[in-house]
Regions:
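Short, low-complexity, charge-dense intrinsically disordered segments
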Residues: 1-3, 7-13
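Acidic (Asp/Glu)-rich catalytic clusters
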Residues: 44-45, 79-86, 109, 113-119
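A structural motif corresponding to the C-terminal end of an alpha-helix
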Residues: 46, 84-88, 153, 157-161
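N-terminal beta1-alpha1-beta2 module of alpha/beta enzyme domains
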Residues: 14-84
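Internal, glycine-rich beta/alpha segment that forms the wall or movable "lid"
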Residues: 15, 61-65, 98-173
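Hydrophobic faces of well-ordered beta-strands that scaffold small-molecule active sites
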Residues: 20-22, 51-53, 90-92, 120-124
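Structural motif corresponding to the early beta-alpha repeats
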Residues: 79-83, 89-98
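Active-site beta-loop-alpha junctions enriched in small/polar residues
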Residues: 25-27, 56, 95-97, 125-129
Length: 173
């Protein structure tokens, strides 16, 4: 089963553009490198605009029914998809920002953007699974503030040759 999603964006001319894509199933009994590759290439050959992956790092037993094993990590999956597709945009439906460092996210997505010829999309969110946050040692109640700060830092890293940032959750020079 595939979940079709749509993204609406505006250009500088204020025209609306709808892009239709597929949320690639990167988890569960049907997920395997072979099936992911087949779905990616089929989706691209059918002319879809987007191929998106889901994110979870540590699946706890209480939600394992929703996200059964295996669960392929989305960032490394996107790097692989960049090499086996040529035109379709690739990205995350929601990358749970507080699960990774701001520097790691910025570097990984900058690399994938280069590998893919500018086809990567970073979809982000704050997350909802309290047990997953606990397992990763991230404070659940601060996930919104962490996400906001990380996104500020990531933007600086992507737009400045020599970036520096001093915040509560991330600092670099």
């Amino acid at each position: 089963d595939l979940c079709v999603s749509a993204v609406i964006s505006t250009s500088k001319s204020k025209e609306f553009v709808m892009k239709v894509g597929v949320n690639l199933i990167n988890f569960g009994p049907g997920a395997s490198p072979d099936s992911i590759k087949r779905w990616a290439q089929l989706t691209e050959s059918l002319g879809y605009h987007l191929l998106m992956t889901s994110d979870h790092i540590g699946i706890k037993p209480d939600v394992q029914g929703r996200y059964p094993a295996p669960f392929y990590e989305p960032v490394s999956t996107l790097a692989w998809l960049a090499g086996i597709t040529t035109t379709i945009e690739i990205g995350t439906t929601v990358l749970i920002v507080p699960y990774r460092s701001a520097l790691e996210i910025a570097k990984a997505f900058a690399n994938i953007d280069q590998f893919s010829g500018g086809r990567v999309i970073l979809g982000v969110g704050i997350g909802w699974a309290q047990e997953e946050f606990a397992g990763l040692g991230v404070e659940y109640k601060r996930r919104g503030a962490i996400t906001n700060e990380y996104l500020e830092a990531i933007k600086l890293l992507w737009t400045q040759d020599l970036a520096s940032y001093e915040g509560r959750y991330v600092s670099f020079k």
